[in-house]
A protein has these predicted regions:
Chain A
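A structural micro-motif
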Residues: 5, 29, 109-110, 131-132, ...
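Internal alpha-helical scaffold of NAD(P)-dependent oxidoreductase catalytic cores
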Residues: 99-104, 127-132, 145-256, 261
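Rossmann-like NAD(P)(H) cofactor-binding subdomain of soluble oxidoreductases
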Residues: 59-151
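Conserved active-site and cofactor/substrate-binding residues in soluble primary-metabolism enzymes
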Residues: 91, 95, 119, 175, ...
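NAD(P)+-binding Rossmann beta1-loop-alpha1 motif at the extreme N-terminus of oxidoreductases
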Residues: 1-59
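Conserved beta-strand termini and adjacent loop/short-helix elements that scaffold enzyme active sites
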Residues: 34, 52, 66-69, 136, ...
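Helix N-cap/beta->alpha junction signal
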Residues: 35, 116-117, 293
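NAD(P)-dependent Rossmann-like dehydrogenase/reductase catalytic/cofactor-binding core
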Residues: 2-5, 234-342
Length: 342, 342
């Protein structure tokens, strides 16, 4: 690439910060980072990072530009890549499409969704039919421990591939994905791979996320205790995983036979790890249940796969979102005399 | 009855206190009450009661005798009735059979289980095969607002019937149940009925308890909000109720077609009522999930009725009990290297 890629990166948690660092220090990208809660701190002092791959004691790191809102695309300065690392909460406006809209140059900006869940590309492709939409599945362990300070303690492995979009030729999208892999890997420290089979990668990750994230959130329980109790694995986690596996199969994705046993044991036991959705509810944050529980359930339904456990998990996580929304003042539940259940 | 019945009453919450009051003031029973948390207060000052049926401002009420532990049966002073109004937590020792054992005179004491749930009689009949075991289903609204102080704000309606026991002739058990109805009603203020069909009464109440109690507990949500959200009713409460109804049917109990719609709407909407199991978990108390969720599920399984929703509710409530037990110091979950899920 002759000139540096003009990258807009939205979302500044652990994943977003480490992506900003890798892209900017690789030298093949100028990163404009859109920050929220940590905007002031990072504008003044830069990020502080302890990283298992980039080194400890990094201070004062700033990308090319730091903004506190999504900029509008300007002529001659279009963003080549718009990387989204925010939570994906489609049940709340503004949703991801709303958030990125001002920055998108139709037919040009490549939209990279570095987010969990199924069918996250659907509303993006609908809104931006002429832009390539790229799947990013990150396996990084990185946490923002206080505003602007990130502890990156597990390797940054990410898989970048193509979401099929009717109006974008596949070779254009593939080239865009491979270019993103190139600029991400330019720092020489991380392991970003081109992903030939995005549905496989996403369904594989859902085996963990749909089960452990939802059940940990409903119970506020770490995954070590689930394995200690055994019954949480036997009566909740495994039945949920088996439904996701069956839905994947019906969608043409054949996951390995031992995938559930592998995912059941994938977390270390000495850290009493709480999955991210559980961390979110404990902080009072909205939860990403629609793409992590709702979409696999709906996909299964379309394909004729019975998912009674997922339906129940969906019912509970949607009810928890209702409570979080009330606590945040986004809704004010009031009893009405003409209610459906009056 | 020539002489007064010698009644032992174990459990001193709202239900237990109002039963003590009705039995003692009716004049056909001498009640020995076994109290725990409120023993000291009530020994000194008696109970304070505001009652929708017995009157407001009752103070200093004491039954014939107040004890702080279950007494041993003494020759010539056997208890005619042992009434149990404690929570029923069979997964913890001492269980109900353990608790009442010292007071039971084999072949004589009639054991009245004024408790919720299915199959609560099974361990009692096993331990005390020669004693009549009586079912009590109470619909009272009574709450102990502070130790020894009870607000009784909804009518005391109870149904008393027979649990079949192989070694106790049915006519003996029926006579015992009817005698209990007589001494309970003697105060002239309450509505205690002989129940011809205990399975019907218990399964009917389970339609509410298995669904609303478990789901409210898992979500810490009142039933008014569930009806406001609608989706909690549609996606959780009704599916659970339908499984209980199907299980009841397989057990030979035909509940009315409209039972679910009736139970969905049975609570007032202006009180934002949290079912008792939800109140328990919010107080850090152990929960009665085995007889309210586990037994209907196991009964359904035996009868070939699929209950995927109940199985999931059971998984969650059992996991919550695990957390409550840990918080109470009853268990100390530790990861072991040779664990099943290592």
């Amino acid at each position: 690439m002759a000139t540096k890629a003009n990258v807009l990166l939205i979302g500044s948690g652990g994943v977003g910060t480490m992506a900003t660092y890798a892209l900017q220090t690789g030298g093949k990208a100028d990163v404009t980072a859109v920050l929220r809660s940590n905007f002031k701190v990072v504008s003044e002092n830069g990020f502080s990072i302890d990283s298992v791959q980039h080194g400890d004691g990094i201070t004062g790191f700033k990308p090319t530009q730091i903004l506190n809102q999504v900029p509008s695309a300007k002529e001659g300065q279009a963003f080549d890549f718009i990387v989204v690392t925010t939570k994906n909460i489609p049940d709340i406006r503004p949703n991801v499409a709303d958030i990125i809209e001002p920055a998108v140059t139709p037919g040009h900006s490549v939209i990279v969704l570095l987010q969990n869940g199924l069918n996250i590309q659907v509303p993006i492709i609908e809104r931006f039919p002429t832009n390539a939409v790229i799947s990013g599945v990150s396996l990084i362990g990185a946490t923002e421990t206080s505003p602007g300070t990130v502890r990156h303690d597990d390797e940054d492995v990410s898989k970048i591939g193509v979401f099929e979009s009717p109006k974008v030729p596949r070779d254009v999208a593939v080239a865009a994905a491979k270019k993103f892999v190139d600029i991400y890997n330019a720092c020489g420290k991380v392991d970003c791979m081109y992903d030939e089979d995005v549905p496989f990668t996403r369904w594989r990750k859902l085996i963990y996320n749909t089960s452990y994230n939802a059940i940990a959130t409903i119970l506020r329980m770490d995954t070590t205790r689930m394995r200690i109790s055994e019954h949480v694995i036997d009566n909740l986690i495994r039945p949920a995983m088996l439904e996701v596996k069956a839905a994947a199969k019906a969608a043409g994705v054949n996951l390995p036979d031992d995938i559930c046993d592998l995912m059941i044991r994938i977390d270390p036991n000495d850290t009493y790890w709480k999955p991210s959705m559980c961390q979110d509810i404990e902080k009072g944050n909205l939860i990403e249940f629609e793409n992590i529980v709702g979409e696999p359930m709906r996909e299964a339904e379309k394909l004729g796969v019975a998912t009674p456990v997922l339906k129940t998990l969906y019912g509970f996580t949607k009810a928890l979102q209702f409570q979080i929304m009330e606590a945040k003042g986004l809704i004010s539940p009031k009893w009405e005399k003409d209610s459906k259940y009056a």
